[in-house]
C-alpha cells in the first residue's frame, strides 16, 4: 500500500514539474455555422518538424480519439469540414474546422507523437447557439475601448420630431441620449447624437470607450406614438482575443501594439495580467517594473498610435497574459482600447545558457561571450548599451560593420568567430561609469538577443596584465620594443599583442611566424611578452592591446597608446631600445648600469694611479738635477747617465706600443659586440656572475676600486630577482664570463701598472749610478 502511494505521488509531482513544450489556445469559442482555426506550437527541432501531428477529442474515460492527423487520417465526423496543415518553417500546425455545431463543444488535445499519449496541449472548444433578434435588427460587433456608430433611419414626416436611443432592460427601454441633449449618466461624455450634412432621413449615435456592460439591444426612435419610426440594433462588446506568442527561454519577444489614431496622443503602456488587475511593466511616462530593468524597450513606431515593446532574456516567470493600452495616466483604464497576448516560454531552449552578470574592476577588462544562431554565421553582430530613459533605449557601441562609438576608442572591440555560434566583445580600461546593462544583437534571428549586466567595482590591487608607462613615444625609423608583464597564472595561456582599429583589434604575428614589421616575442622565464616595431612608421601610431586567451576563449587585456614622432635633428640614434622597456626594467637595469658606471669611475679616479704618475714625473726631475750636477763634476758621469737613460726609454717605448695595440684590439672587439646588443641581450651578457667572479678572473686588478661594496649590492639584487621568478621555470645556471668592456679595462689597468713599475726603476737607476 505504501509503495503504491509513493508511486502515485511520484507520478503526480513529475507531471506537475514537467511542462509540455506544446502550446496553443486554452479556450476557443464560436457560434453554430461558423469556422475556427486553432494554431498549436512545438519546439523547433528536426524530429518535431517531421513527426506525426494530431488532433483528438477526450472522452469520459480519459481516452483521446483521433479526429485528424498529419499522416492523412480523417474521421467520419470531420469528413469534408476539417484539415490539419503543418508549417515546419514556423514550428506550428493549424487545425481548421468548418460548419460548427453545438455537438462540437468539448475538450480536445493538439499534440505530437506516434500515439496520442505523446506531447500535447489541452484545448477547450465551445460552440454557442445563434442568438435570436427581432426583425430588421442590425448587429454591431466591437472590441472593448473602441467606438461604435449606430445608424437610425426615419421617414420624412418625423424629420422635425424628437430623436432618441434607448437600451432594452427587460421589458423597459431606458433612454441613453435624445435630441433634447439628455444623456444618461453612465454614458456621459461617451454618447453623441448627430446628423450628417443635409440628410433628412438618418441620424447617428456614437458611443465611445465601450465597456462590457454596454453590450445589449438598443432601439432608435424618431417621433412619438404610433407614427414613430423605430430601428433595432444589437451591440456586442468583445474582450480582445489574445494573440499567442511562443518563445524560447533566454530569447526575446516583441509586442507590436496598434491602438488607432484616436489614442495617438495619449500615454502608452504594457501591463501583465494578474488575476483581476493588470500591472504596468513599462509606459511612456517613465514607469518601469524592476523585474524588467535592463531588458525592456518601448519604441514608438509612427504618429498613428503604433508602438512596440521588446523584452530580452526571457525567464520562466515571464510567461503569462499581457495587454498594451493607452491612457493619459499611463495606466489601464476601463473603456480604453487594449490589445492582448498570451506568452508561452519554452524551457527546452536552443539558446545556450550564458552568464547574465559579468564583474570587473576599474582599470581592468572584461570579455563577454554573445551567442547567436549558428545557422546565421554571416549575420551582422552588434553590442549596445541599455539606457534607462523614459522608454529605454540601446545605442549601438560596436558592430561587425559599425564604427566604435565616440568615447570607446581604443578600449572596445568585437571579435567574430564564424562557425562557433558566438562572438566576443572585449571592453578594457574599465570605469565605474561602465556599469549597467548591455545587449547582444544580430540582424538575423531576432530571438537571439541576450542581456548582460556589467558590474564594475573599485580595484584593490594592480591589474594582472601591466604595461608601463601608459603613454609611449616611438621615433620613426628606429626600433621600438614594449613589454607586457603577466602573472604565473597565465603561464599556460596564449599571450598576444594586437593593434586596435575601428574594425577590431588585429593580432600581431610572433617571431616564429615570419619577419614582419610588427612582431611579438615571449620570455616565459621572466613572464614578459614583448612587441617590437622595426622600423617604426607613422602609421604605427595608435592603441595596442596585450592579452591572453585559450583557443577562441579570450581573457584579460590591457591597452597602451603609442605615439609616433619624427626624429629631432641632432638627436642620437638609439637602435635597440625604447622608453617603455627602460621604464619597466628600471629597478633591475638601472642598478646594474649604475654599479658598472660607479666601478669605472672609481677605477679611473684611483689615487694610487695618480701617485704612480707623480713618482714618474718626480723621478724625471730628479734625474735632470743629477745630470746637471754630473756635468759640472765630470764628463764620465754624463756619459754614464746617458747610457742609463737610453736603456730605460727603449723598454718604456715598447711597453707603450704594446699597451696601445692591446687597447685598440679590445675596443674593436667591444664595438662588434655593441652592434649585436639590445636591452635584453645586454642584460644577458652582463650577468650577476660576472660581478661576483670578476676579481678571480682578473677583472679588478686595480685593488683601489674596493669592489666588495659593489658585490654586496649586486648580490642582494640577484636574490630579489630569484624570488620573483615563476616557480614553474627551472633555475638558470649562472656562468661567469668576461665582457669585452672588462677586457679593455684589464688591459688598461695592466698598462698603468707596468708603467708605474718602470718609472720606479728609472727613479732608482740614477741614484745607484
UniProtKB/Swiss-Prot annotation:
GO terms for molecular function: epidermal growth factor receptor binding; polymeric immunoglobulin binding; polymeric immunoglobulin receptor activity; transmembrane signaling receptor activity. InterPro entries: CD300_family_receptors (IPR050671), Ig-like_dom (IPR007110), Ig-like_dom_sf (IPR036179), Ig-like_fold (IPR013783), Ig_sub (IPR003599), Ig_V-set (IPR013106). Glycans are attached at residues 90, 135, 206, 471. GO terms for cellular component: extracellular space; plasma membrane; receptor complex; recycling endosome membrane; secretory IgA immunoglobulin complex. The keyword Transcription regulation does not apply. Residues 21-126, 135-237, 240-341, 353-457, 463-563 form the Ig-like V-type domain. Residues 569-604, 619-640, 719-741 are annotated as: Disordered. Coiled coil: none annotated. N-glycosylated. N-glycosylation is required for anchoring IgA molecules to mucus, but is not necessary for Ig binding. Residues 19-643 are extracellular. Residues 1-18 form the signal peptide. PROSITE patterns: IG_LIKE (PS50835). The modification Phosphoserine is found at residues 678, 687, 694, 740. Disulfide bonds join 40-110, 152-220, 257-324, 370-440, 484-546. It comes from the Eukaryota. CDD domains: IgV_pIgR_like (cd05716). GO terms for biological process: detection of chemical stimulus involved in sensory perception of bitter taste; epidermal growth factor receptor signaling pathway; Fc receptor signaling pathway; immunoglobulin transcytosis in epithelial cells mediated by polymeric immunoglobulin receptor; receptor clustering; signal transduction. Pfam families: V-set. Keywords: Cell membrane, Disulfide bond, Glycoprotein, Immunoglobulin domain, Membrane, Phosphoprotein, Repeat, Secreted, Signal, Transmembrane, Transmembrane helix. The chain crosses the membrane at residues 644-666. Residues 595-604, 731-741 have a biased composition (Basic and acidic residues). The Ig-like V-type 1/D1 domain contains three complementarity determining region-like loops CDR1-3, which mediate interaction with IgA and IgM. Interacts (mainly via CDR1-like domain) with dimeric IgA. Interacts (mainly via CDR2-like domain) with pentameric IgM. This is Polymeric immunoglobulin receptor.
